[in-house]
């Protein structure tokens, strides 16, 4: 067992989980649309691919720190299980329109934001103007 990596992941997960909880407190309504869960999942869908492509490459983060941020922070910050529970709650309440919007925005929006983040990170990583300045 890799104790050091496990502690790093757990430490970062602590902060990711707390931030998700606080956003949920502010945005989620007990019987309404799950804005908090949608928000954290879309933020995570953008930030994690960007982090993995750009920040790790540019800042030369260690594998251990990348693991702690990716698996720890963003793993705790984003939540597929809460997404699923929220979707089921909308179905049980027969809020069909809200269910369709929630699932659609979560899935399509998440993938599109991930693609955008990756594209943007590649562009920033391979910026020819910046490379000329640094040479």
From Swiss-Prot:
This is Fluoride-specific ion channel FluC 1. One of its GO terms (cellular component) is plasma membrane. It comes from Latilactobacillus sakei subsp. sakei (strain 23K). Na(+) binds at residues 75, 78. NCBIfam families: crcB (TIGR00494). Belongs to the fluoride channel Fluc/FEX (TC 1.A.43) family. Its main location: membrane. Fluoride-specific ion channel. Important for reducing fluoride concentration in the cell, thus reducing its toxicity. The lineage of its organism: Bacteria, Bacillati, Bacillota, Bacilli, Lactobacillales. Na(+) is not transported, but it plays an essential structural role and its presence is essential for fluoride channel function. It catalyses: fluoride(in) = fluoride(out). The chain crosses the membrane at residues 7-27, 32-52, 65-85, 96-116.
């Amino acid at each position: 067992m890799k104790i050091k990596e496990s502690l790093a992941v757990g430490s970062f997960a602590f902060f990711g989980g707390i931030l998700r909880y606080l956003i949920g407190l502010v945005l989620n309504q007990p019987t309404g649309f799950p804005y908090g869960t949608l928000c954290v999942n879309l933020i995570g869908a953008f930030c994690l691919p960007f982090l993995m492509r750009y920040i790790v490459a540019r800042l030369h983060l260690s594998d251990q720190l990348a693991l702690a941020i990716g698996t720890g922070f963003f793993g705790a910050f984003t939540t597929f299980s809460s997404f699923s529970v929220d979707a089921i709650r909308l179905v049980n309440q027969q809020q069909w329109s809200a269910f369709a919007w929630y699932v659609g925005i979560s899935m399509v929006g998440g993938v599109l934001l991930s693609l955008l983040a990756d594209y943007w990170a590649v562009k920033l990583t391979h910026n020819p103007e910046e490379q000329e300045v640094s040479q």
